[in-house]
Design a protein with these regions (language model features):
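NAD(P)-cofactor binding segment of oxidoreductase domains
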Residues: 69-96
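N-terminal Rossmann NAD(P)H-binding glycine-rich loop of SDR-like oxidoreductase domains
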Residues: 2-22
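Alpha-helical substrate-binding/gating segment
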Residues: 144-149, 162-190
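Conserved beta-loop-beta element that borders a ligand/cofactor-binding pocket
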Residues: 125-148
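Active-site helix of classical SDR
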Residues: 114, 118-121
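SDR active-site strand-loop-helix element
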Residues: 6, 26, 61, 96-102, ...
Length: 191
């Protein structure tokens, strides 16, 4: 599978990049195959247009994972996501997997904040993308993926209950990408 990972240098992106070593990473941070800011990138730039045109799937992780970040960060995440969805549609990318969160529908009596609303918008964009023939988008409500497993015993119970280890993370992303656990394309999945 030819995979592009937007947000390849973040906590989850690095894990997916390791699991899919032939993928192309796009990130604002150094170390990515393509260094670009989704807020300002020219998607017609040859290297990006070629990566998207050749992609079987794009994984979009290039958003803040901080539910308490200022609202303008989450507004920008929505704008960046919309730009990426439009570029994928133009390039004919058959599948997009976008990281959502259970903050889109919070538990424990918490109210939905800008972070949660931004995830709802990304879920709506995924549904809209999937309306076109030959296209599919999955909004995956990712659990808590700490930077280090050392954080798990220190976390409150509600967060530990939502913990995804690397095995679960990779299993869920493979499924969202239409792959079997051993990395083969699942029967009936778009290429």
């Amino acid at each position: 599978m030819r995979l592009v990972i937007a947000g390849s240098e973040g906590n989850i992106g690095r894990r997916l990049k390791a699991a899919f070593p032939d993928s192309i990473g796009i990130d604002v941070r150094r170390g990515a195959d393509i260094v670009a800011d989704l807020a300002t990138v020219d998607f017609s730039r040859a290297v990006i247009a070629e990566a998207l045109t050749r992609a079987d799937a794009v994984v979009h992780l290039a958003t803040s994972a901080d539910p308490d970040a200022p609202d303008d960060i989450h507004w920008q995440a929505v704008a960046n996501g919309a730009r990426l969805f439009a570029a994928c549609a133009h390039a004919g990318v058959p599948r997009i997997v976008v990281a959502s969160s259970d903050w889109a529908e919070p538990k424990n009596g918490m109210t939905t904040n800008a972070y949660g609303q931004s995830k709802r918008v990304m879920e709506a964009l995924s549904a809209m993308y999937s309306l076109a023939p030959g296209r599919d988008a999955v909004a995956l409500r990712v659990g808590w993926v700490p930077v280090s497993v050392d954080e798990v015993p220190l976390a409150p119970d509600w967060l530990r209950d939502n913990y995804w280890d690397d095995a679960r993370l990779l299993t869920e992303f493979r499924r969202a990408l239409g792959l079997t656990d051993d990395g083969q394309l699942r029967a009936g999945s778009p290429p």
